[in-house]
């Protein structure tokens, strides 16, 4: 940008902009935030605001755009949502008192990972992640600036780092080391993350655990440094860092969580249709965030799981108390967000009133829990500190109808401060005095229309029309002349006005000062407020689980020390809820101690995938402390769940369906243990028939011989069912069907043994394929099943058109029938039939 011959104000802008080249600089000028040069051009397009110019008559006018300061947040939100950073430069002194250029400084840099204020606040976490590297070790730290949560872990490879970032749904990553080209490609382009660099470490280590590994320490320290560098203030609400290991929880990678629809529906990207949607009967924002966290990280500690189950049972046993509890929770605001606003110095009167309302609800919540007289609730009750002194302070100080803007006045209650009350008394009396003066002068002058008005320029004045100017008293002095009237003052009116203006100014200043003192006092309670928030959130989640257990007819699962699975009449709770009035068909899942693999066969659309997801969903629900959809359930505690359900190319990274299949299979067999759960659905369909079948069999054998994990393996390769005779720990199950009068009904019921048919042609019929095509396919399938019986020969090819449909019409005997006769078509599946048809078509 050209900087020659700039005005002092523009030179100031340029100097500040140099310090923040990667951010839009919002430069406060009076009632607007202005943007200049490229920032103005780009912002005008993104925000759809007018682009003008400064010094329009100059040879090189400076592009300029601006937004009103009072509505700037909505524009900032748009920029942040699109992945930009925004630096806020404020006026640091009153322009009226400034000598020369008004002093301006950047007071905050807002980035996608550091959003605290928003015009559209929601209850989701916004995690900012930092990663550092030392040799082959990675440190990953993350925090939520709203809640103050702060965590760190160590990871052994970059794939795990990416998986954790995906799970957190982070938008910004702070890098403590130089990425390789491949790593930057993955983070920036494939994962669409905003990348920021921080090479300095934060010096104040009171939030850090000095027992952390070096790379965990540096990741945490650089994250703190970045946050303090961008926010430029004390962040007293940040909690001490908590170290965790992925293996401390039920491990599930991003693909697994997506395929199981845990927190959002994979197809719609929305909450509805997910486990989170099913379980969310929370009443508070803190509870909603905590529930999402529990779903992301189910437990593997049986004692902690049982502790949650016992509280759910207590709530189930106390229906009326639980109803009262639910009503009380509705009066609780987002304490964590309010605490962060206090820490950031952005609290307004509305925030404090919401905090007081919340604190006033706590004694009732605590009394309800104490009234249940259950020892298992003691740890929750201990966290419910109502902080009565804080509630009393806010209630006594803040007026119930206080405006949101601090400087609007009317914030502090009458009676809270004696001096403030005196100023307000002067203002009230001054108003009465003015009314008395108006009446007196109207009577003395005989001007019936005489009245006193006010504006900022002239203050209080007598308004006299031109027709009455001859009756103006001698002690009136002229203040302004208008077209049809004049404005006058008197010494008495000026004296009262002076008293009122002084009282108004002193009142406003004192009220602001009192509010600042109260806000500072509230800041002393941040840690206690965060403890309270955690307690309320936990109560809220557990009551939510109780409500869902009751309304969805769930039961308490039992955990054994063995690997046996015995789920009687289990259901997929989300599918059942989505189906609504339709009847869901329950299925029993039984895998004995010595059974590690169920080979699941059956037609497409018959329910194989739902059956598999049902087991995984039940395990997740059980291990997060929820009750489960079944008549009874006995489960082991799994350490990890691996899935390959559904097929899709990874278009972003250019990987085919088969490559994605193999990568996910490799992830499972590389990391699974005997305590894991593996779900593979139609593995191998992304490649040629025999390649796929060979790989599927070898993977089954590897799991059987080397891992021993509980595994559901759904396949269209019917030949694999013969493995039951050679693999001791494998059993066949299938989805039952009913054939009657040429019609096929899928019963969605799992039964022992292999499927005898795949009914692919029936599925094709449901899909709406042409009748003549289906008839021809049925004849070919019959021929293949009969081994050696001549199939109806195709018609003689006479044109390019007939070549396209030759497999479906009569024709002279074709040599290709010899190839058909050589095929091993015993129990051949429809998918294999389609593969054969493709090969035959290519040879015709």
Curated annotation (Swiss-Prot):
Entry's Gene Ontology BP terms: mismatch repair
UniProt-recorded Gene Ontology molecular function terms: ATP binding; ATP-dependent DNA damage sensor activity; damaged DNA binding; mismatched DNA binding
PROSITE patterns: DNA_MISMATCH_REPAIR_2 (PS00486)
GO cellular component term, pick one: cytosol
Keyword Zinc: no
Signal peptide feature range: none
A Pfam family that the UniProt record links to this protein: MutS_III
Matching InterPro entries: DNA_mismatch_repair_MutS, DNA_mismatch_repair_MutS-lik_N, DNA_mismatch_repair_MutS/MSH, DNA_mismatch_repair_MutS_C, DNA_mismatch_repair_MutS_clamp, DNA_mismatch_repair_MutS_core, DNA_mismatch_repair_MutS_N, DNA_mismatch_repair_MutS_sf
HAMAP family for this protein: MutS (MF_00096)
The protein's name: DNA mismatch repair protein MutS
Gene that produces this protein: mutS
